[in-house]
A protein has these predicted regions:
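Short beta->alpha transition motifs characteristic of CBS
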Residues: 45, 52, 96, 108-114, ...
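Active-site-proximal beta-strand elements of phosphoester/diester hydrolases
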Residues: 1-12, 38, 94, 107, ...
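Active-site catalytic loop in hydrolytic enzyme cores
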Residues: 86-159, 172-180, 245-249, 259
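Long hydrophobic alpha-helical segments typical of transmembrane helices together
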Residues: 212-262
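Cys-nucleophile CN-hydrolase/nitrilase-fold catalytic domain and related Cys-dependent amidase chemistry
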Residues: 15-16, 23-100, 107, 171-189
């Protein structure tokens, strides 16, 4: 499977400009033979303009129509990063998954909101894990800060996911965290991690890029720099069975010993 990660500087507050950027890059990936393209977090408006509520996509209709048309016209699967969706008066950080025929397969609202950045003042949190199939391949997606919660990612692995997608808007000062956490989640869950970040700036934020494809051994198969680019790599899902046969952490788990509520 050939996957392209669309790493680009998002234009704050300008949905149409960002639609145009995404369209051109996805078309380029499709022409290069990619089976799938993956977008970063909040690629429609960035993170986030002062008038975000008024600019938000009501029920995600604009983004869904755009992604479905783009996927069908390019015959490419899309992990639609995330967009600002308005629903019942609240805003959600929402991901849409679309197959190569333009059918919406799944959606996800970011569940862990980044309180140091005040996300909880802007967005309402989601309340469910996102696992889905594209073709016959079980997959899952999370969003940015969700990556720091290992138990959340482990739930995706236990649900059978073979690929975890991580759209993000990860800032440059924590680049090392980004690289380590993505590799760690791949190793401990013995699946592929496909993590796409934005680049450029938004206000005081500078995003670190370095979109990555990581195999279940934690080896980086493809990685971008800190600027605009399409990062492309190929994955071979057959290695998952081989790795799990050699070190079977799922067989050796002791869930009866794990008590995760703890103290806040």
């Amino acid at each position: 499977m050939k996957i392209s990660l669309i790493q680009f500087p998002i234009v704050p507050g300008d949905r149409l400009a960002n639609f145009d950027q995404v369209r051109r890059r996805v078309q380029q990936a499709a022409r290069a033979g990619s089976d799938m393209a993956v977008l970063p977090e909040l690629w429609d408006l960035s993170f986030y303009p002062p008038d975000v509520y008024d600019l938000a996509d009501e029920e995600g209709r604009q983004a869904q129509a755009f992604l479905q048309d783009l996927a069908a016209s390019c015959h490419i699967q899309l992990i639609g990063g995330s967009i600002v969706r308005r629903h019942d008066g609240c805003l959600y950080n929402t991901t849409y998954i679309v197959d190569e025929e333009g059918n919406r397969v799944s959606s996800y609202d970011k569940c862990h909101l980044f309180t140091p950045g005040g996300e909880e003042k802007v967005f309402a949190p989601g309340d469910h894990l996102n696992t889905f199939f594209l073709g016959d391949i079980p997959m899952a997606s999370i969003t940015c800060y969700d990556l720091r919660f290992g138990e959340w990612v482990r739930m995706a692995a236990l649900a059978g996911a073979q690929i975890l997608f991580v759209p993000a808007a990860w800032p440059h000062p924590r680049l090392t965290h980004w690289q380590i956490l993505n590799r760690d989640r791949a190793i401990e869950n013995q699946f592929f991690v496909v993590a796409v970040n934005s680049c450029g700036t938004c206000g005081d934020y500078r995003f670190c890029g370095h979109s990555m494809i990581i195999d279940p051994w934690g080896e980086v198969l493809a990685q971008g720099g800190d600027g605009e680019e399409i990062v492309t790599g190929e994955i071979d899902l057959s290695v998952i069975k081989d790795i799990r046969s050699r070190i079977n952490v799922f067989r050796d788990r002791r869930p009866e010993l794990y008590h995760l509520e703890g103290k806040r």
